Amino acid sequence: MAEKDEVNTLRARFRGFYPVVIDVETAGFNSGTDALLEIAAITLQMDHHGWLKTHKTLHFNIEPFPGSILQPEALIFNGIDPDNPLRYAVTEREALYELFTIVHQGIKDDDCHRAILVAHNAAFDHSFLMAAANRTKIKHNPFHPFATFDTAALSGLVLGQTVLLKACLTAGIPFNTSEAHSALYDAERTAELFCELVNRWKRLGGWTKVTTSSIHSV
């Protein structure tokens, strides 16, 4: 039975970074002006054999920030009605405060130094997360300000697919198109996909042992 030593840790595998899968649904493409409407986050953990798997899940429907723009075509695309009281939406600050608290604890528990966002077409999700963090002025944002793991790029390399649906199906992960464009569902599939990509590389012998001294902060 493999021991969970320095090799079989998130810290060692990702160079001190704590990966968190994020998916957002928005009211447009401009993170500075268009509303963030939904966010889901899934933390990851590594077992004693070094296999990556999902851990905790968070999900929030979010109230449009004051003065934000709601692009009609975006709302049609994701099917979100921002005025629906059954969304039980919270403010950006409430959502990010809880998310950042959980992530900070995960960083501490796994002896990492910073979180890194994992997403499909990560630049989009990262831009909205950073914009919301700047608006809410929450101190100590745990996420790296520019580095990400993009499962679209990784899937293109490993699977020859860049669309989330096609990448999941190619990787043997079921995908229900009727549930797509929900932040929670897409985050769950993206997390499964990222774990499969990392674990597949390990199965192929692509992940070699490292020493503690080789792990440096950015």
From Swiss-Prot:
Mg(2+) 1 binds at residue 23. InterPro entries: Exonuclease_RNaseT/DNA_pol3, RNase_T, RNaseH-like_sf, RNaseH_sf. It is an enzyme of class 3 (hydrolase). The record marks 29, 77, 124, 146 as: Important for substrate binding and specificity. The active site is at 181 (proton donor/acceptor). Keywords: Exonuclease, Hydrolase, Magnesium, Metal-binding, Nuclease, tRNA processing. GO terms for molecular function: 3'-5' exonuclease activity; magnesium ion binding; nucleic acid binding; RNA exonuclease activity, producing 5'-phosphomonoesters. GO terms for biological process: DNA replication proofreading; tRNA processing. It holds the Pfam family RNase_T. Its EC number is 3.1.13.-. GO terms for cellular component: cytosol. Mg(2+) 2 binds at residues 23, 25, 181, 186. Its cofactor is Mg(2+). Trims short 3' overhangs of a variety of RNA species, leaving a one or two nucleotide 3' overhang. Responsible for the end-turnover of tRNA: specifically removes the terminal AMP residue from uncharged tRNA (tRNA-C-C-A). Also appears to be involved in tRNA biosynthesis. Homodimer. PANTHER family: DNA POLYMERASE III SUBUNIT EPSILON, RIBONUCLEASE T. This is Ribonuclease T. It comes from Baumannia cicadellinicola subsp. Homalodisca coagulata. The lineage of its organism: Bacteria, Pseudomonadati, Pseudomonadota, Gammaproteobacteria, Candidatus Palibaumannia. The gene is rnt.
